[in-house]
Each structure stands twice: as C-alpha cells, then as structure tokens.
C-alpha cells in the first residue's frame, strides 16, 4: 500500500512538472504511468534502449518464419494504406521485441525510425508508456499520443498498436504504427486493427485447414469482412475452433470448443449442411434467440491460405525504379496480384483501381 501511495504521489508531481492535468489522461494511460513509476523509471531521463544481438534476432526470426510469412504481407499492405510521410509500421513478438519494420525515408531519419528498429524491446518496463508496450500489457488496441508517453524523449511520437490474438486466445504479437503526426488517429488505429484481424483470420484458417469453416454475422453484408465470427467444425458436427468474434457474438451460450453445433444453434447441423456446402447464405438462430447469417468459408480440407515464398522476390516494373517510394508501391501491387492472380481481387485488397493494377503488371 505504501508503494502505491508513493507512486501516486510521484505521479502527481510528474504531471505538475510537465504541465499536464490528470483528468485529461485516460485510465489506461494513468495506470501505465503508475506502473512505470513503481518500476523505477524516470521520465526526465533518456530511456535505456534494450537491444538483442543480431545473431539472437536472426534465430528468433527463423523460429517465427511461418508466422512472419503471414504477417509481413499484411504490414506491407498497412504501410501502403497509411497516408502521409514520416510513418512506420512494426511487428513485434508477444513480449514487445520488434522483429520487422517498414518506414519511409523521412521516418528513418527521425526519432521514430532511429529507435523502433528490429531487435529493440518496447516493453512498458523498459520504454515506459508507449503504444506497443501498452498493447502487450493490456492485450487490446491502444493509442498513445504525444505527452501520454511516459518518457519526455517520446513526446513527439504518436503510436497506434493492436495485438494479434491466436485461435487459442493467446497474444502472439503486436502490430504498431508510429509517427510524429497527430492527425487521423482513429483512422490509423482502425487500419492497424484491420491488419491484425486479417492476420488472425489467416492463422485460424491455416490451423483448421482440414475442417469445415463457417463465417457468421448478425448482418449478411458483413459476411465478407474481417469482423465475422468463424467456427471450425469437424465431420461429426463438433466445433473444434472459434475465433474471438465468434466467442463475443455467442457469449452466454455453452463453451464453444468441442461442443456440438446442435447445442449452439436451434437449426441442426444435418438439416443445413447440404445448403452450406452449396455456398448458400442461411439465417439461423442460437439457443438464446439471436439470429445470424452464416455461409461456408472453407470446405473440409480446402485451405485457402497460400504460403508466401520469401525467396521468390518480386521486383518493381521498369517505370517505377527511379524512387524508393515508387518501387515499394509497385512491388506491393505486383506481389499482391501474384498472390491472388486476379486483378479485381487485388484491386479490392489494396484499395486501388484495376487500371492501376494493370499498369504495374504489364
């Protein structure tokens, strides 16, 4: 209790010295600051950046290679979606160890690019309150903007982070976007969350590649989005996997894992299986009376996940080789097209016109 009282007193002193008001600070941020104070961090000194060796980093990357093959294309897409300059995107493991980064030239020369680098550890107990570290602690999306950072050295940075939650409910990584700009904060966080959901969906499909996967949502127009609930069902009609959205939407029912489909929904699995396998969208009701629309996402043994072979490098077309930004944009477009082999699908995925896609692949 004495330690907590001491930390609260020091918290107020720090706010006064930095001309900040506690009532303008969110609860998550203020609690993070108190944890930092209790750890012995001093916001008026430069943080002691902790880096692992290049050999260690290489070994950890190799151990996470299968996961990185799914994550890297998503952070490349996220980077292309964030408008403006001086932005960077990073992927860290579940402990806040940065493994991969993408940033523009302006960011590389600034505070963000020089400090958020592969091999750096951004856990809260090391770097104080920051977006990446706070998502590690809270296991939820976070924004830490400007003076909300515990260390004065980080005051010019805004961070947007979201955890990657695996099919078993465990946090397996963090996606973070950082900049020195304060504009479009909620928009940026929404894009970061979208990237993590897409990663989670791909991991779920990969894990249950031999099962029937059903997508469901209370609104039929959302069935093609990353906000859907996913259920993996075996040949006996038993649920063997459920994603986070499914658990939220079916909260209050039985424990989903290893539960028979018929104990979750009033429509028996055998009565709708034929229509589902024929790609029909059905409206079904759970045992609490809530209705959802459901459609087959994947048939038994029909995994749609394609491993990205990082050894087969995609190069920019001739007209895009004059600047780094042009090259990076072109490589992203060409690699996305090669992955999907469909101009329309690549256009929707990247949010650019089909004409733009066509220019870069011919």
Where are these regions (language model features)?
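PAS-family sensory/regulatory modules and their coupling/dimerization elements
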Residues: 147-148, 156-161, 264-317
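Glycine-centered loop/turn motifs
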Residues: 118-120, 256, 262
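Short, solvent-exposed loop/turn elements at beta->coil junctions and helix N-caps
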Residues: 147-151, 218
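Intrinsically disordered, low-complexity terminal regulatory regions
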Residues: 1-125, 133-143, 156, 165-236, ...
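Signal-transducing coiled-coil/dimerization helices and immediately adjacent hinge/linker segments
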Residues: 202-260, 323-331, 335-338, 343-344, ...
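Dynamic helix-loop-helix/coil hinge segments at AAA+ ATPase domain boundaries and subdomain interfaces
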Residues: 314-326
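N-terminal sensory regulatory modules of PAS/LOV and PAS-like folds
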Residues: 132, 254, 261, 269
